[in-house]
Amino acid sequence: MSLGNLTFGFFSILVSSHAHAGSNIKSQQIFLVAGLLIMIAALFDGLDGPLARKLGVQSPLGEQLDSLGDLTTFGLAPGALIYQMYLSDLRIPLSFSVFPTFLPLGLAISAIFPICAAYRLARFNVTHDNKSFVGLPSPVAGLFIAFIPVTAYNDAPVPLPYALALFIAMAILMVSNVKYSKPQSTLKPHFTIVRLIAFAALVGFLMYLLGWYWVIFFVVVLYIFSGLLAFFIHLLQRIRVGFDKRFRPGERDNT
């Protein structure tokens, strides 16, 4: 499964390289395929852990392959996708130099995402928390970026400023200290067979009604904001406690 993840991520990079920044139909179709390949790779990545635990074939080698696959699919592939979609023509001319004649600003910006993904995965490999992730998981960040060409093909293209802002925001969240819950640890104790069937039926109905990509996109966005909301609530609580200790020490001592 890890190799399937890596393979489809590599396919996405190759497909992205055959398109060019612009709004023509052919390029949009190529970018759509590149985004869908990232989603297929995410399916392999999602099945990898449960299958390994079910079959009892977990190993250090598998963990390393999983990290390399995630870096390819959710780090390099989204960076290549956004570069080809928006940044390949973003250059700063250099009149004072013979070689090169321009500064490839687009290349530098697109490299931010794989750099942050690599750091995020390396940090995950050396610091384990059974209940939560520190920083946005790279598969979620990569999936979010993969939806940009999907929404652009089915609806309206995402303007360059918004696409870049989202691209950089996802990269920053990966290396942030924002904590995200592990769905398998949080939801598993509350799921029964009946609830699982009901949930699957609801998801299937929503996919039929709204379109599969909007349902998955909503789940991804909901997960991203869940960590941010918890982070800001915790931050406000710390500020309030610090305020009480500094400006109302007497009240706290009398309680």
For the regions a language model picked out, list residue spans one by one:
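Multi-pass membrane catalytic core of lipid/isoprenoid biosynthesis enzymes
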Residues: M1-L3, G35-L36, K54-R120
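The first (N-terminal) embedded transmembrane alpha-helix
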Residues: M1-S12, T73-A77, V140, F144
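Topogenic membrane-insertion module of multi-pass membrane proteins
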Residues: M1-G46, V219, Y223, A230-H234, ...
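Helix-coil boundary and interhelical linker segments in multi-pass alpha-helical membrane proteins
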Residues: F11-G35, G79-A108, I148-A163, L209-W214
